[in-house]
Amino acid sequence: MSQSPQTVDQAISVKTDYEDNQQEHIPSNFEIFRRINALLDNSLEANNVSCSQSQSQQQQQQTQQQQQQQQQQQQQQHLQQVQQQQLLKQQQQQAQQQQIQQQLLQQQQQKQQLQQQQQQEQLQQQQLQLQQQLQQQLQHIQKEPSSHTYTPGPSPELQSVLNYANVPLSKSAAFNCNNSSSYSVGPTPVQSPVTPSPAASAVTVNSPSYGNFQLFGENAFDSTTPFQSDGTSQSHSRSLANDSDPMVVMSPGRDSIIPLSPTEKILYQNFLLSKQAQGENTALPPSPPHEIMPLSPLEKKLYSNLLSKHTQGMRAINSTSPLQTPLTPPRSPQEVLYASMPAAQVGESSSVIDMMSRMDLSGRNQQADYSGTLAFLDAHNVLRRRTPSSSRSRSVMERSAPSSYFANLDPYAIDRAARLHRNAAAVGEASCTWSGHLPPRNHENPVYSPKVFLGGVPWDITESGLQAAFSKYGHLKIEWPGKDGYVHLLFDVEKSVRSLLQACTHDFSNGDYFYKISSRRMRSKEVQVIPWVLADSNHVFQPSQRLESNKTVFVGALHGMITAEALGRIMSDLFGNVVYAGIDTDKHKYPIGSGRVTFSSRKSYMKAVQAAFVEIKTPKFTKKLQVDPYLGDAICSLCNSHQGNYFCRDLLCFKYLCRSCWYWQHAPDSMRQHRPLTRNTKSSLSL
């Protein structure tokens, strides 16, 4: 099929038009480069803008950080200033408190001084009054030997003794309606001049003279030797005296002399001195039977009631005395008062009276000497009642001590010595040593004490810092024992202790617990946490054995790592036959540094007591323990009437004693070095 020429021409024209149009729309290379450069310039400008913006932002951030740092520094400086101010305030408060305490102490000292001065003045007045009364009575007796004159009313001392003896005033021969001013004590026998014996020598108190009369001596109340010096038997004299005086009350026994108070002694001796002024004398042999003068009704009633008031106590003492002697026939009061005594006893009693006569008016020292001397005399009376008459002279001579020992005696020296002995482990020498490893602590589901020990505490730690560190485990209190480096944490419940131990680092090789705390100077410091398992407080080695207190020793100065089992093992290795061991604890069931060990044999017990100090050596520590007899409640072994608050651990004594008997027992020079023990009631626990 053929095309026409017109059609071809049209097609060619269309093609050329299209090509022309395409060339017009396609840009040239220059235009393309220009556009690319424009785009690059735009991108560079954008980049420059963004860089400048980022730099400005960084600068702003840096300035902000600098400002923040400056603010923090300012805050720290402010805090430091506040802390310094607080420290200054605390120091000022402490200084003020110290000043207040010093002022209070000064006021207390002034009050005590005033009280002491008042007491001294009262004592001086009382002594002066007593001396004046005694002088007046003696002068009155010397002036009127045939009668004893009384005032219309009784003196205060006479009235007190009459009330004590239950003697009504209406029955007194000195104060009746028929004779209200004086009464006669009996016929006046003819008196021959006789030189007094050394046993009845005069006693002087500064200027007053007391003749053959002793203030607080017991010579007038002793009957250990025969009364007569002319061969007349004492029993015959007693029978005649009792026949002529049916109102005489029987004495409880030969050696059980009834102790009287000082006022009773003075009054009763003054009664009988009236008879002495009429012809009787302690150094004279007794008069014939028909010349023995009867007692007045007042004397009979007084002596009878005094005997009845003391008989019950004396029976109890005599019933427990292993040296009790058989009862003797009854004696009259004259024989009881004027019986003679061996020379050794007279000399000793005279020395005591001399010591009493030299008492000064120096306040507290005088009062202590006075009370100590009375206690010594009471103990001396008790010992004389317990000692047989055949060996009494030898016993007194062996135990005799110079009067200066009792005159200069400090009644509180024994208490100070006992307190010093409690800390004797620091200076004592160990007699034996134990070396080894402590038994391991293996407990399943242990129960702890709510009290925990912290060791190695930073020196600058405060209570608030400790509260902040440990309050997360439970409510607690901080106890500062007073030494740097350790404290006690006291939680309310045992569960808090468990939580604390779980947060601690546990050294399984040694069983130690460590906890990290921070202070102002130390950011991280490990302190040792030492809990106490309640099962470690007691350990029984022989369950079938009975625990006896007389085979138990007290062990002091224990280390905190020593358990009851460890203590028992140590004592068993050293002395053997351990039955039980226990650790003493406080009210929170935490150890207080002492324990008890009970033995099954007396031999092991005595070996432990004789050791006194034991040194313990372990890989962790070395410690010296103090071993003493375990003390309980006991009666004095000598008088059997007072509480035995002191124990002599020396093997020559080894018994409980009261204060008076202790001084009397240890009067010889060879026994003054014995060490006293007292019971510490705060820490001692009964078995």
Curated annotation (Swiss-Prot):
Give the RRM domain ranges.
450-529, 551-628
Q: List the disulfide bonds.
A: none
Gene3D superfamilies recorded: 3.30.70.330, Cytoplasmic polyadenylation element-binding protein, ZZ domain
State what this protein does: Sequence-specific RNA-binding protein that regulates mRNA cytoplasmic polyadenylation and translation initiation. In its amyloid-like oligomeric form, acts as a translational activator. Up-regulated at activated synapses where it is required for the late phase of memory-related long-term synaptic facilitation. Sustained CPEB-mediated protein synthesis for at least 72 hours after neuronal stimulation is required for the persistance of synaptic facilitation. Activates translation of atypical protein kinase C.
Region of interest called Disordered, as start-end residue ranges on this chain: 139-159, 221-246
Question: Would I find Chloroplast among this entry's keywords?
Answer: no
A Pfam cross-reference name: CEBP1_N
Q: Which SUPFAM superfamilies match?
A: RNA-binding domain, RBD (SSF54928)
What GO molecular function terms would the record report?
identical protein binding; mRNA 3'-UTR binding; mRNA binding; mRNA regulatory element binding translation repressor activity; ribosome binding; translation activator activity; translation factor activity, RNA binding
- List the source organism: Aplysia californica (California sea hare)
Mind naming one GO cellular-component term on file for this protein? neuron projection
Is Coiled coil one of the keywords UniProt gives this record?
Answer: yes
Where, subcellularly, is it found?
A: Synapse, Synaptosome; Cytoplasmic granule
Q: How does it assemble?
A: Exists in 2 different conformational states, a soluble alpha-helix-rich form and an insoluble beta-sheet-rich amyloid form. Stable self-sustaining active amyloid-like oligomers are formed upon neuronal stimulation and contribute to long-term facilitation in sensory neurons. More than 80% of the soluble form is found in high molecular weight oligomers, the majority of which have the size of a decamer or larger oligomer. The insoluble form binds RNA with significantly greater affinity than the soluble form.
Please give the name of this protein.
Cytoplasmic polyadenylation element-binding protein
InterPro entries associated with the record = CEBP1_N, CEBP_ZZ, CEBP_ZZ_sf, CPEB, CPEB1_RRM1, Nucleotide-bd_a/b_plait_sf, RBD_domain_sf, RRM_dom
**One example of a Gene Ontology biological process annotation:** negative regulation of cytoplasmic translation
